Amino acid sequence: MTVFTEQKMSLDVDKLNKDIAAFPQVHPITKDMKLTHKGVSRLVMLDRYTFKDTEKITLSEGDFVVLTIKEDPKFPARGLGFIKSIDWETKLASVQVDEEFRHTLEKPEEVETGIVKRSLDVIEKPLEIFYEQIAKRNATGLASVETTEEKRQEWFGKFYQELVNLNFIPAGRVLYGAGAGTEVTYFNCYVMPFVKDSREGISEHRKQVMEIMSRGGGVGTNGSTLRPRNTLAKGVNGKSSGSVSWLDDIAKLTHLVEQGGSRRGRVG
């Protein structure tokens, strides 16, 4: 049962493990798990790399969640807290924000109580609280290519030991995707071919960039092949808006494509 002590709530491991049972990708919490990280490292791990109940099938009062504490079109402030109550009709939840993240609160009542009311759309329930859970999921996914169960177990053990002992830390996209059963990329960054200097070429490039971003990748684009601003576009008797404007258009995709948690696409 979730424990209430004045304004503090604590993680109910037994309940979370029951919820985890509905997700075959996630490994349950065991007593030997200890690594949760601290501060920003913990928030980044929980927000970007853990497996979550994205459909909120198991979300209920007392659950530990990641949420947007302060809305901002470019840099929303994320934090951690516990669900106090849920109104499923209005899709709003009251959340007790962890003390570490209350400095971003602005409304006097929220500052005083530490309790905020937020849309369920900006609340996520992580099922992996310990790094060891992520390591087990990753090791399972990386070993899954082996053709026999014996080999899968062998390589699961090898991968897990390297990961859990922090001898090797995979790229963020591997941490997020390996073993999750989702169609995401394991590569953090992609360098795109030169953009063809035509409407069709730009449209095709933009399409490919969006596809990569939607699967978690960052994209490097070289716009030197695009004609400068005010250059004549003969076919339509008009002028080009220039390479900078087209690159800006591609860069704006980063604000439209979310990649898990609060992570967004990257353009270089």
Give each language-model segment a name:
Residues 1-268:
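Extended catalytic cores of very large enzyme megasubunits
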